[in-house]
Amino acid sequence: MGINCLNIFRRGLHTSSARLQVIQSTTPTKRICIVGAGPAGFYAAQLILKQLDNCVVDVVEKLPVPFGLVRFGVAPDHPEVKNVINTFTKTAEHPRLRYFGNISLGTDVSLRELRDRYHAVLLTYGADQDRQLELENEQLDNVISARKFVAWYNGLPGAENLAPDLSGRDVTIVGQGNVAVDVARMLLSPLDALKTTDTTEYALEALSCSQVERVHLVGRRGPLQAAFTIKELREMLKLPNVDTRWRTEDFSGIDMQLDKLQRPRKRLTELMLKSLKEQGRISGSKQFLPIFLRAPKAIAPGEMEFSVTELQQEAAVPTSSTERLPSHLILRSIGYKSSCVDTGINFDTRRGRVHNINGRILKDDATGEVDPGLYVAGWLGTGPTGVIVTTMNGAFAVAKTICDDINTNALDTSSVKPGYDADGKRVVTWDGWQRINDFESAAGKAKGKPREKIVSIEEMLRVAGV
């Protein structure tokens, strides 16, 4: 990096014009485009910028605002998880990174165009669809996805009109992962605990009128296979005025298996057994009801029918027995999946992810031939598994692969590439995002919250000055 570049970086002149001067003055030969400004994209950018001196990284994001699931997926009462935004911000302010918000792959720009303009393209646009139960009546108004519910209270543009019906007593959540527990906690938490978070105002208003008293958390398998983690369960058990009720029969013989379990699973199971032993000592006006060994069978107005299952080699096999649960509102939380946004992407529609080997996107599935210069990271490549640390490690690995391919000349970077052409596009730069950030922070401060998110794309663009 040249002296001028270092001076600009040290002075902290992270405006778009300063960044452009740095990029032009050092005349880099390697241009890399990352599509998606979520955790996978930022972690990959962080490592690439560290390992490749002579490169420019452009991050293209379909929304005006960055951070993906950290902004729109992490529960509002988990602000400590959102601290990773500070790390992403440092990466975004690197003088060799440019942010292009409000640019959608497949609509505003094609993959072919990006490949023509960059030496390498890394797809990290995540998983924005949810898996279906595939049951009759699933399209009823009282059946919604946990993903949409999370987007609703987190202010994802387009989710503000979801209007979940919270006028009934009973809610059934199908699935037992951490997202399902987050949703249960949001439904059962005292409103005062949420007022100081960045929960959207319209969600707070709806929750203030909620009549929900009982939340069933239903899973196909048993306690030893529960997908939620100990942190999320502890939070549920500590909720004021909420009585957690386990079914004793679900834990038959479980205590005899404790010594065989790995430490994380053992600690989680011990906490469930402790809670089971103590249940009934504290009475609350609301109830959290985890139910195991039940598979969705049918949906009817006001209720849901489940098949009783039994475990056969860790798999849940339905029996002839059934159970019905009162369900004024049903939330499915059985996994996310990605979508194919451009015809140039080698997409596995069955698995809902991009065909790849260790982050290199395949050109030919049969032979395993990779498509040089085209990569994938995050949930788009792996499927929706793990937590942010999992995504970080995966993104670092793919970023290292990109660097290795460039350094070993497996990827040809000898030709000059122009980078993205933003002329005529309503692009939100990093400066524009900072204006949105300042606006949201000020609006939140006036209400005693960390921020009040803008939920309209047009309003975001207006505040950004686009």
Curated annotation (Swiss-Prot):
Q: Does the keyword Membrane apply?
A: yes
Q: What class of enzyme is it?
A: oxidoreductase
| Gene designation per UniProt | dare
Tissue/organ expression: Expressed predominantly in prothoracic gland of the larval ring gland and nurse cells of the adult ovary. Low expression is all adult tissues examined.
Location(s) in or outside the cell: Mitochondrion inner membrane
User: Which classification does the entry list for the species?
Assistant: Eukaryota, Metazoa, Ecdysozoa, Arthropoda, Hexapoda
According to its record, how does it sit in the membrane?
Peripheral membrane protein
The record, for PANTHER family, names: GLUTAMATE SYNTHASE 1 [NADH], CHLOROPLASTIC-LIKE
Q: Tell me the protein's name.
A: NADPH:adrenodoxin oxidoreductase, mitochondrial
Q: Which residues form a coiled coil?
A: none
What EC number(s) are associated with this protein in UniProt? 1.18.1.6
Q: Give a short account of what the protein does.
A: Required for synthesis of steroid hormones, for olfactory sensory behavior and completion of the second larval molt (a steroid mediated developmental transition) and pupariation.
List positions binding NADP(+).
Answer: Q176, G177, N178, V179, R220, R221, E232, G386
Q: Which domain of life is it from?
A: Eukaryota
Q: In which pathway does it act?
A: Steroid metabolism; cholesterol metabolism
Q: Which reaction does it catalyse?
A: 2 reduced [adrenodoxin] + NADP(+) + H(+) = 2 oxidized [adrenodoxin] + NADPH
* Main location as per UniProt: mitochondrion
- GO BP field: cholesterol metabolic process; iron-sulfur cluster assembly; metamorphosis; steroid biosynthetic process; ubiquinone biosynthetic process
